[in-house]
Regions:
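Signature aromatic-anchored transmembrane alpha helix within multi-pass, membrane-resident enzymes
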Residues: 10-13, 187-191, 257, 263-266, ...
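Transmembrane-helix motifs of polytopic, lipid-linked glycan transferases
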Residues: 76-101, 132, 136
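Hydrophobic, aromatic-rich transmembrane alpha-helices
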Residues: 89-92, 171, 237-278
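Hydrophobic/aromatic-rich transmembrane helices and adjacent perimembrane loops
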Residues: 127, 165, 276, 295-326
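Membrane-lumen/periplasm interface segments of specific transmembrane helices
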Residues: 38, 180-249, 281-288
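Specific aromatic-rich, kink-prone transmembrane helix
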Residues: 89-94, 110, 114, 129-152, ...
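Short acidic/glycine- and proline-prone juxtamembrane loop motifs at membrane-interface regions
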Residues: 119-129
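Membrane-embedded, lumen/periplasm-facing catalytic core of multi-pass transferases
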Residues: 47, 337, 341-401, 405-409, ...
Length: 477
């Protein structure tokens, strides 16, 4: 019976991949905006710049897995995300099955059609790779394959930095389960990447010393509302699934209360596996709430980071489906109708609240427009050095962003005496005054620069920091 069900699930996932692939192909835009484009560029230029495979912001494991697909363009990178999502759904389903959930297949729908995760599939973002590694590791743990689980989970920090948040809790779980030898393999990823990176950075501690978020304070605003991510549930899980998730979480708390009376150490393996899943989800939630509240470690307060732990959230939601399902054990058809109705509402919520296919955002559209103007202007010269920050410029202006002869960061334009004559400066009101800390007047009023073109959207809108979005193209005299 289980083998037959697995075959059905594989067929359904193959169909899901086909549907997701079609959706990302017809979508010109992407979730994550500039971050998504930048992750694509890191992978796209790996053949020319192998050191990209060790870039901490790009995330080494994510860039490695994305590279073969990125050679086919940005759409190829999004195809990777669709494939990774379907593999993640398989691991999530198998984990639910191992945990004894009769409604394990529901976990696939709850994962793929949680609004945030569904949106992130149409991107080149690291959250998808993080979810893939996490789901594989959790599945291996519940399958009692602790050695290989440790190896897989040791790679989490190289998919996203939050891996360093989850690893201590995973390590404690291993020690409490007396898996002492497998515990040692949890450090394999850090050791391996430290040794590989040493030959490039000449720093055995590069994994920690080159963390791009360790001293990033003050770039983004802080929040006085600690529970911001809790309030973001309509985007993260969607309203229907949030209700199911709450039921699943309450079901776990009741099980925890029962286990605490007899001793948690005496509880069975399924409960201990559930405890790990819930603790990891809570650790992730509180860690992000803290760094956003205090404005540390480069937190921008983005809800999309929770796509990385969506397999955990989907499993808790699947537990909620199970709690709804069990009271109707007397009637198989009624159970099936109830579950199908709930899942239909979950899927419907996504398509009712989001438009598909996804088109380019207003910032990206204006950047592409400016790129078309530049390439058709008399100022365009192949290989000309361009100073910019917005990653979309690398695509729109046909620039290799990792070639220092073609590209430099916008903040370098502050010192005009160091800018070669004829160089182009692409200043946009998103990154210019925020990440680069340069006001447009600083360049406008500099006699060494001339303004070539100003791009203003037909329908004005504000960007990060409350600035009216515009693009200014300057040339160094």
């Amino acid at each position: 019976m289980q083998v037959k069900q697995d075959h059905i699930v594989l067929v359904l996932l193959a169909l899901a991949f086909g549907g997701l692939a079609w959706l990302v192909v017809i979508s010109t835009g992407t979730e994550g905006g500039e971050d998504s484009f930048m992750h694509y560029l890191f992978a796209r230029y790996v053949p020319q710049h192998p050191a990209n495979l060790l870039d901490h912001w790009g995330k080494p494991l994510h860039t490695l897995l994305l590279t073969p697909f990125a050679q086919f363009g940005f759409t190829g990178a999004k195809i990777y995300s669709a494939l990774a999502a379907c593999i993640t759904a398989w691991f999530t389903y198998k984990t639910a099955q191992k945990l004894g959930l009769a409604t394990a297949m529901a976990a696939i729908v709850l994962l793929l059609f949680s609004p945030l995760y569904f949106l992130c599939i149409n991107s080149a973002l690291t959250e998808i790779t993080f979810a893939l590694v996490l789901s594989a590791g959790i599945y291996l743990i519940v399958s009692d394959k602790y050695y290989i689980a440790a190896v897989v989970l040791s790679l989490l920090p190289f998919a996203r930095t939050e891996g360093f948040i989850l690893m201590p809790f995973i390590g404690i779980y291993y020690l409490l389960r007396k898996k002492y030898y497998p515990f040692l393999f949890l450090g394999l990823g850090v050791v391996g990447y430290s040794l590989i990176g040493y030959f490039h950075f000449e720093d055995i501690l590069w994994v920690f010393s080159q963390n791009p978020y360790s001293d990033k304070v003050g770039v983004y605003p802080t929040s006085s509302h600690f529970w911001q991510y809790g309030d973001a549930y309509p985007l993260i899980l969607g309203r229907p699934q949030t209700l199911i998730f709450v039921i699943g979480f309450i079901s776990f708390l009741l099980a925890f209360n029962r286990a605490s009376k007899t001793g948690i150490s005496n509880a069975g393996d399924p409960f201990k596996h559930w405890l790990l899943i819930v603790v990891l989800a809570l650790a992730f939630f509180f860690a992000h709430s803290i760094v956003w509240h205090f404005g540390i470690m480069g937190s921008a307060g983005l809800s999309r980071v929770f796509a990385g732990i969506m397999p955990l959230l989907a499993l808790i939601s699947a537990r909620g489906i199970e709690a709804i399902y069990k009271p109707f054990a007397f009637n198989r058809n009624l159970r099936l109708a109830l579950v199908c109705t709930v899942l239909f509402i979950v899927v419907e919520f996504v398509f009712q609240n989001h438009r598909f296919p996804v088109h380019l955002g207003p910032e990206e559209r204006l950047l592409y427009k400016s790129g078309e103007w530049y390439k058709n202007s008399g100022y365009y010269k192949p290989g000309n050095k361009i100073y910019y920050f917005a990653p979309t410029v690398g695509i729109a202006y046909d620039v290799d962003p990792f070639d220092p002869s073609q590209r430099a960061y916008l903040d370098a334009a502050k010192n005009s005496e160091n800018i070669p004559s004829g160089s182009i400066i692409v200043y946009d009101m998103h990154f210019g005054p925020n990440e680069c800390k340069i006001q447009p007047e600083e360049i406008k009023n500099n006699p060494d620069y001339e303004l070539l073109k100003q791009f203003t959207p037909e329908e004005p809108f504000t960007t990060l920091g409350g600035y009216n979005y515009e693009i200014f193209i300057f040339r160094r005299k």
